């Protein structure tokens, strides 16, 4: 399970700015006006694409009139209760307030591990930063400027030190022989019906009412001598549509399931086509870098012309993930399930494939010779060498010079070239580009005395000519 870190504090102390800085997104609204964030929402803190922990942003707790019993405060209380670590965020420019004192007293009753994060330290003396909140008695205090990304490395390091010793890798290794599959999609597309069909029993509650599944449910399956771990998740909606507190927690559990799976099956309603909500779910899968299979459910109920329309809409809206296989099936009647498992296996094998340094360098050399990078403002990028940097998804680090001007079109060319050469199906491929990291830079072979004498003789010979 991904550990969870909650951001708690009064309004306008910079919680949403800190959330955006930790998750490298702009998901949280940021404004000088207090109270912009009312609900809680979730993101993931990653370094080089590897997830470290989930982050939940909460609304600011306001004065005693609404106080700790208000709706926004209830959201913050729920977030703090489910978190592994709480970050109590304060504003050094405004100093400690009575509301800060009230929130701290509530946090101490909660008995959750808590770090004091002093925000907006830019332009403030160190003496002021450390003295303003000294009376709170925190042993762990992290000064940051979320807006300028100052102190974030120290904050992440402190958070990791406080988190329980568990990770995605450990969760997956609980049964490394099983293929971990998450069935995800918007509400009421048939995820629970599909899992029940695969299991051959009514394990999940099935209803026409969207949102019947409120938690991620994990079950094991053995089929055709293969072992699987299936996760039926709650439907993901756009954030504006997520209202109930329980449903917000369900959305977080779904994001956790995506982070922990090896293959994500995105279930679509063939009759409704690809909707904006489907795009929201797909974005979560792509952000996590997971292998993907697209399943068009309720295919058997479509007429010929409806199927043609569905295919056309799919190619137009999901053309940017044309590397993912599409399976047409009926969860209700069981058609297409064998092809679904075949697609899952192909995606799983591709996502976890191991590469040697020699074979990826050979591929880079051929790609470079076939189509060199274009000249950008008189500069041409040089790709010197590449090495594999991980799997699920396959990741490669390319070293060279002037890589900052390498156009996105050429990066996509490399991705497609590697995908075709190594027959990678159903998995994203990531490239990281590094400049000036030549391992042999600054190193020289020390010449022996004999080599030095030989070089001198050669130089005398050259001079006589």
Curated annotation (Swiss-Prot):
It comes from the Bacteria. GO terms for biological process: ribosome biogenesis. Residues 3-167, 179-352 form the EngA-type G domain. Transmembrane segments: none annotated. The keyword Nucleotide-binding applies. InterPro entries: AAA+_ATPase, G_ENGA, GTP-bd, GTPase_Der, KH_dom-like, KH_dom-like_a/b, P-loop_NTPase, Small_GTP-bd. GTP 1 binds at residues 9-16, 57-61, 119-122. GTP 2 binds at residues 185-192, 232-236, 297-300. GO terms for molecular function: ATP hydrolysis activity; GTP binding; ribosome binding. The keyword Nucleotide-binding applies. Residues 353-437 form the KH-like domain. Keywords: GTP-binding, Nucleotide-binding, Repeat, Ribosome biogenesis. PANTHER family: GTPASE DER. Associates with the 50S ribosomal subunit. GTPase that plays an essential role in the late steps of ribosome biogenesis. Belongs to the TRAFAC class TrmE-Era-EngA-EngB-Septin-like GTPase superfamily. EngA (Der) GTPase family. This is GTPase Der. It comes from Xylella fastidiosa (strain M12). The gene is der.
